[in-house]
Amino acid sequence: MLSGCNRFHVITREYVYVSARQVYLHDRVAAVSNRVALVSNGDALEVIEHGKRFVKVRTSKGEVGWLEEHAVIDDKLYAQFQDLQKKHAQDPVVANGELRDDLYLHVLPGRETPHFLLEAGNSKVQMLARGTVEKAPPPGSLPAPKPNTAQPGANTSGKPDQSAPASVKRASVAAPTAAPAAPPTPVAPPAPVAMEDWWLVRDAAGHTGWLLANRVDVDVPDEVGQYAEGQRMIAAYPIAKVLDDGTGREHKHEKKDGKGAKPQDAEDAAAAPAAPKEETEYVTVLSPQKNGLPYDFDQVRVFTWSLNHHRYETGYRLHGFQGYLPVKIGQETDKGVTYPTFSFQIATSPDVSIDPDNGVTRPVHPRTLEFRLEGNLVRRTGADQAPIILTHDPADSEKAKAAKKKKR
């Protein structure tokens, strides 16, 4: 009976996965050894034997050799990356980005968190969520020394000074005199904790992980990106398309002067397309150039295309609120006419909830604002028509404008 059960014994295989860019397998652990195979980032290797700081593995081609443990991740960490991919497989894309250089996908935000897959520079990624964590101190940095509040020459031990005369010693022991207390040395307030932003991203193959935000360039068309005015453009969403045939048919009634219809400006005439051209209109969201903010954006700006001037113009602008991704683009029909729409959440108070694991921030009391685009006009729609209360001082935006004007 026992022998029959042994036939159903399942052999459990242990695997590790290459986290280094590339690494050679060696035939033995020694100062002098031979290379037997080259493995690359993401390769799965079957474990044959564990050594001290080394592991013996077999490749999918049957090649066997040793490599250092720090060049691979184990099954448990690999499973965490797989779970992260499954959990966010259906998350909406809030923006598209391009990597500035080669970057590792991390399982959580943070420079010291485990990483696995290496994404090549210039790769396109889908951006899913923004998280904020404390910035790791640079290597070798020491904590600031505590301020010394003792006065020079003061004896803080509570014992008589052995270098003082005997009469002074006896006096200090028998009847210590209370000296007037010196005012405490003012202590500088602690410096604010440095924070840094990370993006949860998904690559073309569906691999998911966290990347340092300042190493990812958001894919924003240059035509609207130039109007950022010193702010960080978080995303640009196409909302509508218009056909510019160069005739300047934006207004039904041309302005009149004493001699008839006013001709189009020479500048507008020069900008008119030679042939009909389709132009895209955008909803953009922006934020100050800071990390660690308790919101994703604090400004929304709609760029519409002027058929008279043949350029982008601001169709709508709102700033000074706490906005949160994603921005949803849609359509609605009213009286037989279909209009493009957009909506997003804002906070009604400074209270936010922060995920302790990944630093993703969400409003405790959110509101959803809805808008639709009617030609070149943006109108507010939806059930919530209450006034929009600004929840923070948009001083950063104003400072950026002032600095720009000063340069001019």
Stretch-by-stretch model annotation:
Residues 6-20, 46, 58-97, 143-274, ...:
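Boundary regions of SH3-family modules and the immediately adjacent low-complexity/disordered segments
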Residues 52-58, 133-144:
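Short, Lys/Arg- and Gly-enriched loop/turn segments at beta-strand edges
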Residues 279-293, 336-350:
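Short beta-strand elements that form the blades of beta-propeller/WD-repeat-like
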Residues 292-303, 351-370:
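Structural motif
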Residues 10-13, 27-50, 107-121:
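SH3/SH3-like (including bacterial SH3b) beta-barrel domains
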Residues 83-129:
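Short, solvent-exposed interaction modules
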Residues 2-4:
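C-terminal motif of bacterial Sec signal peptides marking the signal peptidase cleavage site
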Residues 33, 64-66, 106, 113, ...:
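Short loop/beta submotifs within extracellular cysteine-rich repeat domains
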